[in-house]
C-alpha cells in the first residue's frame, strides 16, 4: 500500500474507489494499491 498525496491509475486494471472519504486505488497487481493521505 502506497500512501500518496495524489493517487493515479498506474495500469488499466486499476480502479479508483472512495471509501469513507478516503480515495483508494485497487488493482489486480498488489504493487499498485494506493491510498490518499
UniProtKB/Swiss-Prot annotation:
This is Large ribosomal subunit protein bL36. It comes from Actinobacillus succinogenes (strain ATCC 55618 / DSM 22257 / CCUG 43843 / 130Z). GO terms for cellular component: cytoplasm; ribonucleoprotein complex; ribosome. Belongs to the bacterial ribosomal protein bL36 family. Keywords: Ribonucleoprotein, Ribosomal protein. GO terms for molecular function: structural constituent of ribosome. Transmembrane segments: none annotated. It comes from the Bacteria. GO terms for biological process: translation. The keyword Ribonucleoprotein applies.
